[in-house]
Amino acid sequence: TETLQPAAPVEIIWEPKIFLPFHPNGMKFVSLDSEGKETDQWTVFSVGGGALAEENDGASSVNTPDVYEMNSMTEILQWCERTGKSYWEYVKECEESDIWDYLQEVWKTMQAAVKRGLDSEGVLPGPLNLRRKASTYYIRASGYKASLQSRGLVFAYALAVSEENASGGVIVTAPTCGSCGIVPAVLYHLQKSREFSDTRILRALATAGLIGNIVKTNASISGAEAGCQAEVGVA
């Protein structure tokens, strides 16, 4: 509303009982003239992973060029075997050089979300009155031994990011908001416990992005389309 309000009065009407057959995540935009008569309308759907689609054509409303020539893991694996290169090197071959600056920003955002989540306490926004628990689990896990500690810390890191998402904090969709804690938790733990360099983390993110893109191209990363495992399973 803040974006459109300067041009004309804006009202958002929620209709939770209306089910749109094309996709559950839909929004109808209606424009009215000064007399309140409808002048135009547009229905668009958020189909997951940042993609928008219209019911008539089902295609993305934003046309973006293909970055990767190969769209299956089999093709990419064969390329890696043929060239002796890794998955992240395939990403390097296809992307522009600024991809590494972008992934650096992604990594910084992930780390910040973990740290904020571990430091924050209190009740999460919403009617359920759920308390944040990441900091408690982190303290508990720190007292465990060996493998139990490792698993406990990863869980605490993932929960920290998920709680940041639930409170409206800045997170990275990996590949979605619903699964935003898994990838940063694993990478954060690897850097803390195994001293992985930022370079190795960025290569891991490039690989993760490649795999996520393959799934999005051939199946779905949308929980609304394919259930929660489309999000968490891909992560």
Regions found by a protein language model. Name each.
Residues 1-12, 203-235:
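A structural-propensity feature for long, helix-poor, extended segments
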Residues 2-153:
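C-terminal regulatory domains involved in ligand/effector binding and gene-expression control
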Residues 53-55, 173, 183-186, 228, ...:
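Basic, gly/Ser/Thr/Pro-rich low-complexity segments located predominantly at protein N termini
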Residues 80, 94, 177-180, 228:
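Generic recognition of cysteine residues
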Residues 97, 101, 105-224:
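Accessory "access/gating" subregions that flank catalytic or transport cores
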